[in-house]
Amino acid sequence: MLSDTICAIASGQINQAISIIRISGPNAFKIMEKIFLGKVGRSMEITFGWIHDDNQKIDQVLVLWFAGNKNFVGEDTVEINAHGGVLNTNLILELILKTKLARLANPGEFSLRAFLNGKIDLVKAQAINDLIHAEVKVQHQAALNQFLGKSSNFIKNLIEKIEEIIGIIEVNIDYPEYDDVEILTSDVLLPRINQLLADFDQLIKIANNSRLIYQGIKTCLVGAPNSGKSSLLNILINENKAIISEIPGTTRDVVEGNFVLDGLLFKLFDTAGIRKTTEKIEQIGIEKSYESIKKADLILHIIDASEKNRQNLDLKAKTRPDQIYLKIYNKSDLLENQEEFKDEILISAKYQKIENLLEKIKSIFAFLGKNKEFVANSFQISQIELGKLAILDAKTSLESGFGPEIAIVDLRIAWKELKTIFGRVDDENLLDSIFSKFCLGK
């Protein structure tokens, strides 16, 4: 994989002031000798000159050459800074490919090479991708913490604890006569296994909060028809996306939109009004409403406060313990007396008076902003959970009467699952899957 030369537009396919075309691999310098009028300077120096095709000038550019190990990728790399028109940039890329000394890079292949060349570990590689795709400040900070290695320390501490136990067991097995190492019997080992499980549980609990940061907080707006769900969605996303009508059952499909509150990304789903109906299309919409409730992190149950005979929808009974459920009483502008709702969240979507709702949501999710150190993406959370399962298997072995020499097999599996987070990956297909989600030219 590392023996050939790759190239790509690193700055995206858009019109811009300056575009960057990146070439990396053993033929990078040879390619520049063919297409650059002038001499490429020494490593880390910028050279000014023309890109040409058989002496036909294409563009006047700045060329920066990074020798060998003195760059992000870890191999000879050239970056061409050209005028940023899409056509102009692609003409230069086509010219590079025309030399037949390089091929077009796959998405994320520069980062993959940096990983394979030992310039970054897998955590940093994924952090770069997360940094690029960050939509809000909290996501940006989480990705930056990953890149700086702050999150890695939590996992590395677990790895070290497992390594220590494995090391002692191996000495007990291979050198039973060695007196300077404690003897780990099943009775001595079991409390340590339980402590490891507690450490895993704590890490998983914190890591699961990361999903809300990286993927956004899935927020479902539900309630009876004409309760004001669509009006509230339009206010939150600052766009007339959902149809507002006096006719019940207007919203028949799930309408989506995003909004940012206190630096956090909320992904909104406005659902069909829930009521008893014989109308088949409306019934399908209501079924989709219940599906959205199942997927939500935050459920906002919108109720028309002005209705004297309000439909009693027991939606809270359909929620899980890990979901947050809020009752929101709308249409405060139609109330003569608001005393009945003094302890409730009362809003007026019509007049955009929703401050108390926003403050309530901010207070609920304030803890996400406080976790400055440890965050994990879905791949890392999956590996931590696999590690915990292996530790549970070790505990089961010990409780079933097997000795440490059997439990060590599961301890090694747990160790491997955690090491995979940093790049101890034996499956090349897994690597391809991870890096294929990266941007072209990265």
From Swiss-Prot:
Residues that bind GTP: 226-231, 245-251, 270-273
Transmembrane segments: none
Domain TrmE-type G residues, every copy: 216-366
Domain of life: Bacteria
UniProt KW keywords: Cytoplasm, GTP-binding, Hydrolase, Magnesium, Metal-binding, Nucleotide-binding, Potassium, tRNA processing
A family per Pfam: MnmE_helical
Primary location group: cytoplasm
EC number: 3.6.-.-
Entry cofactors: K(+)
GO biological process, one term: tRNA wobble uridine modification
SUPFAM superfamilies assigned: Folate-binding domain, P-loop containing nucleoside triphosphate hydrolases, TrmE connector domain
Binding residues annotated for (6S)-5-formyl-5,6,7,8-tetrahydrofolate, in chain numbering: 22, 79, 119, 442
Binding-site positions, K(+): 226, 245, 247, 250
Subcellular location: Cytoplasm
CDD domains: trmE (cd04164), TrmE_N (cd14858)
Residues reported to bind Mg(2+): 230, 251
HAMAP family, alphabetized: GTPase_MnmE
Protein family per UniProt: Belongs to the TRAFAC class TrmE-Era-EngA-EngB-Septin-like GTPase superfamily. TrmE GTPase family.
Name of the protein in its database record: tRNA modification GTPase MnmE
